[in-house]
């Protein structure tokens, strides 16, 4: 994942805790457990599929819950990869190669979600009268 952060949209509409931090932490655990580079690739691809739709709606205490869910999912993906199980290229935007999976996620963020998520969240916050 050394190239993941430069591939994402600047200030991505998806939760960075869920799509970057947790999978990266789990990759470190996987490395320490002796998983091969291919198994770590498989684990990270599966982890990206699990959390790709989680949007960022601002930093707040509930982000810790998102981080926990993402880390648990990433560690589950590690256990799956250890057994040769992974998300495959017939399951949405995931590809067999992590770099291509991240490029696909970038396209999803940039072409579909970028700016739209902020506008929708702004409307929701105004409707809830949290801001004036």
Model regions and ranges:
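Alpha-helical transmembrane segments of multipass membrane proteins
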Residues: 4, 28-29
């Amino acid at each position: 994942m050394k190239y993941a952060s430069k591939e994402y949209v600047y200030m991505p509409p998806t939760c960075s805790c869920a799509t970057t931090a947790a999978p990266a932490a789990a990759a470190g655990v996987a490395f320490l457990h002796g998983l091969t580079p291919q198994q770590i690739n498989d684990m990270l691809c599966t982890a990206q599929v699990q959390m790709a739709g989680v949007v960022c709606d601002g930093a707040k205490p509930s982000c810790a819950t998102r981080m926990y869910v993402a880390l648990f999912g990433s560690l589950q993906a590690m256990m799956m990869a250890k057994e040769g199980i992974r998300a495959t290229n017939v399951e949405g935007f995931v590809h067999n190669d992590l770099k291509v999976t991240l490029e696909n996620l970038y396209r999803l963020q940039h072409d579909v979600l970028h700016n739209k998520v902020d506008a929708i969240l702004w409307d929701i916050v105004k409707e809830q009268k949290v801001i004036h």
